[in-house]
Amino acid sequence: MHQPLTADLNPADEVVAVYDRTGNPIGRAPRSVVYSGGLWHASAGVLVRTGDGSRIYVHRRTDTKAVFGGYHDCLAGGVVDPGETPQETAIREVGEELGIFGTADQPLQLTEIARISWDGEWNNSPLRCHLFAFELRYDGPMAHQPSEIAEGWWWTPKELGAHLQDPSWPFVPDSRALLADYCWS
């Protein structure tokens, strides 16, 4: 497979890592090309739970998001940038979206909880993504990124599980697939 071209990029179009079907990084391309061409890429997200694990942070994406706008999610995350690992992406995204940052003395302690390759669809186009989920136990403050998150709240695993059982509930489908086998207790 050839490496996607990066010439003549629109400077406003974010460049993301492109992967092959088996999960190996093979190049880079503008996000718009990845989405319009159904190219494989990778995404990483963080499931934030209270320190005791009794609550999970759930949020609603802003209506202006390019993909799954207005849908609910329990992962703060995004696409993997060229040269970035999924864990680095997860750390970057939980900082950007929820204002949760580690320090040199106390880096964020993420635990990988799931990974899948999702060959889905959005707006009648293929959407192919290698998905990585990490868990973070956290009891501190949060600050939503206004362009990404409209609102958020803490739910028990039972509350979230009940909502996920309802296929009509507008929940990000790739996160739903990624966490299908996750133990919510």
UniProtKB/Swiss-Prot annotation:
Name the UniProt key words of this record, in alphabetical order: Hydrolase, Magnesium, Metal-binding
Q: Which Pfam families match?
A: NUDIX (PF00293)
Query: Position of motif Nudix box?
Result: 77-99
Q: Which cofactor does it need?
A: Mg(2+)
**Origin superkingdom:** Bacteria
Q: Does the keyword Metal-binding apply?
A: yes
Catalytic activity, EC: 3.6.-.-
**Which residue range or ranges hold the Nudix hydrolase domain?**
39-177
- Please give the start and end residues of each transmembrane region: none
One example of the protein's molecular function in GO is: hydrolase activity, acting on acid anhydrides
Indicate which residues the UniProt annotation says bind Mg(2+): 93, 97
Identify the enzyme class: hydrolase
Family (UniProt): Belongs to the Nudix hydrolase family.
- What's the name of the protein? Uncharacterized Nudix hydrolase orf19
